Amino acid sequence: MASEVLDEAEREVFNISDERPQDSGPVPINPLLEKALDRIDELAGSDGNLTGVGSGYKDLDALTSGWQKSDLVIVAGRPSMGKTAFAMNLVEHAVLNYDKPVLVFSLEMPSESLIFRLLSSIGRIDQTKLRTGKLSEDDWPSFNKAAKALKDRPLFIDDRPSVSPTEMRARARRIAREHDGQLGMVVVDYLQLMQIKGTNENRVTEISAISRSLKQLAREFDCPVIALSQLNRGLEQRPNKRPVMADLRESGAIEQDADLITFIYRDEVYNEDTPDKGVAEVIIGKHRNGPIGTVRLSFLGQFTRFESHAPPRYDDSFTHG
């Protein structure tokens, strides 16, 4: 395909392939052992049990040890569960605490909306005030502090509504080339909006190719790729609407390619009388190299923000206080 030829040409121009050992063919055992020992030394000197990019949530990091290099992480949920808010909280923590660039492909929302969400979360400013410009006198110091925190941070947002895997790799290479060949994290919102241009394949086959391309992206840049994903609406017919692996839309390839799959679930979306108002569950349904389990977080909707240490129950006043 012409796109593949262009993709390979750009790789050669940027000399990316020379830096990626996985592109160089079979490697003998001795250098692999040396690399493994170097990695063990690196991990031994790391802070606590965190060996990847931290999420900002202690209980979640205890299960994952952070988002690992070369991993494809899926964050899935039904509409209104807070997938984008959660992803942007991960972006916020990464750009404020790590030096490597973070690249966000926002196929659903314009970049302005994402910046509003970041400012709302960091400054604890009601997002409605930001969207309408109706900030109070007390809000402005928080706004200025949030804007200052983000200024000059290595965050890049691509909000073009349609992108192919080839285009995504090309744009990632350009950012990496400007930062010593490195990326700290890539976020895709969301997977099902990606397209392979010119394909005549059915949608399941196309999603399979997209899923595989995201895993290849993680491998090429040796960074975590966090991709948001839709879930089948059929789960809403069940009494217990907590997602399971089979609920992933066009799930076969996604389930196979992902190293870690998380589901976002908030019971209050379905049950007005739930005792778990303001509580979100981050359900790890697949973890190729670690445990699965559920982490409870608090959800502050007005700030588009998830926070750690949700107690067993919240009263309704918490989310409005």
Sequence positions of predicted segments:
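Amphipathic alpha-helical transducer elements in NTP-driven molecular machines
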Residues: 3, 54-57, 111-115, 137-147, ...
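Short, small/acidic-rich helices and loops at N termini and domain boundaries
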Residues: 1-46, 50, 76, 81, ...
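Cytosolic-facing regulatory segments adjacent to core modules
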Residues: 62, 93-182, 196, 295, ...
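Structural recognition of the conserved hydrophobic beta-strand(s) that form the central parallel beta-sheet
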Residues: 187, 224-229
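P-loop NTPase nucleotide-binding module
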Residues: 66-109, 169-178, 184-187, 198, ...
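Walker B catalytic acidic pair
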Residues: 190
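C-terminal regions of RecA-like/P-loop NTPase motor modules
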Residues: 166, 170-183, 212-221, 233-321
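Pre-Walker A adenine-sensing motif
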Residues: 57-66
